[in-house]
Amino acid sequence: MTKFEAKRIYEDLSNDDGYRVLVDKLWPRGVSKEKANLDEWCKEVAPSNELRTWFSHDPNKFLEFKEKYLEELRNNKDLKEILSRWNKKDKVILLYGTRNKDCNQAVVLLEYIKQVV
């Protein structure tokens, strides 16, 4: 069974990171492609531009953001194929750029994956 975790892309690489997937729409500032050491940049699972802009990483909006993002995930036609691909890996790290480790799309995506997988 695949193990999924969320991790900030600015954290140091770990030998046990597994398959590293950036789940942001935008490339994180100050991170080179070499430093990111990505296996995949999956913009398809990131929140829509409208939702991302509205949320603007405001913790006061997180609960509403979570609800809206979960709705986007439920309606995402590509997600089934993406999860099927990820489920072939031993470990998948969902990478995000924001500083807030508790209020971000990777946390919501991780929760969603754990419910549907």
Show the residue positions of the predicted features.
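Residues lining hydrophobic/aromatic ligand-binding pockets adjacent to catalytic sites
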Residues: M1-V117
